[in-house]
Amino acid sequence: MGIQKFLFAVVAVIMLASRVHAVDPPPIDSHLFQSGELVYTDGFDGPLNKKWWQTRTKNWEVVDGLLIGAPDYKDVAEAQTALKRDHHLGLSPVIRLDNLPSKFVVRMRVKFEGKEFKTGRPKFDIGHHINTVTFRDNGYVVKLHGGKQFLGKAPDVKLNEWLDVALEFQEGELWIEVNGKGQLIKHEQVVLEGRSELTFKTFEDAPNRIMFDSVSLWKAN
């Protein structure tokens, strides 16, 4: 069991105990915030929680404690025949973690399948095409909507392996941490601009599944 899965199990047990014995939920673990409320946590042991997740492609399912997204079609020809168009073919799994608070902390364990990193993939958007985090060998790039970029190094950032990712957000400030190494970004372009979501995208050629092992979201004060 990975450390993120173990921590999720601890959080889930504490939350269950709090309902029975009125124990306070675990405190927020944050570089930016002193307090917050745990609003969602999931180890994917049941059906997909559609309050928090919005699938943008069709082939998403919860299997054996994992949320897994796969391509809707095996190749371009099959997709174009089925959809009768040449764009938005569903070859790259896409999903959104929705309804983010204006100030939040999210911790997750995610894996991107693939043969090699490519320009702009795999990635997730903070807001709708506003701020983008793109993974690459042993690191990532944060690109703000005005074009400003921040490079980040992190250990063991590889395809086909689990990544422990933490984000802390409030307007003007973003803490990002990958596999235990983080950085604080302060910039006026750190905004959501009305779209409170994280959107995950990957390659269009197989192997290209996206997998989530656990996620926890706090509303920060």
PLM regions and their residue ranges:
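Secretory/extracellular carbohydrate-interaction modules
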Residues: 73-145
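Short tryptophan-centered beta-strand motifs in secreted/extracellular beta-sheet-rich domains
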Residues: 44, 106-108, 161-178
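Extracellular glycan-recognition surfaces and repeat-rich motifs
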Residues: 49-79
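Bacterial N-terminal signal peptides
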Residues: 8-17
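Flexible glycan-contacting loops in extracellular carbohydrate-active proteins
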Residues: 186-213
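Extracellular carbohydrate-recognition regions
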Residues: 23-57
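Beta-strand-rich interaction surfaces with strong enrichment in secreted/lumenal proteins
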Residues: 29-30, 92-98, 151-157, 187-188, ...
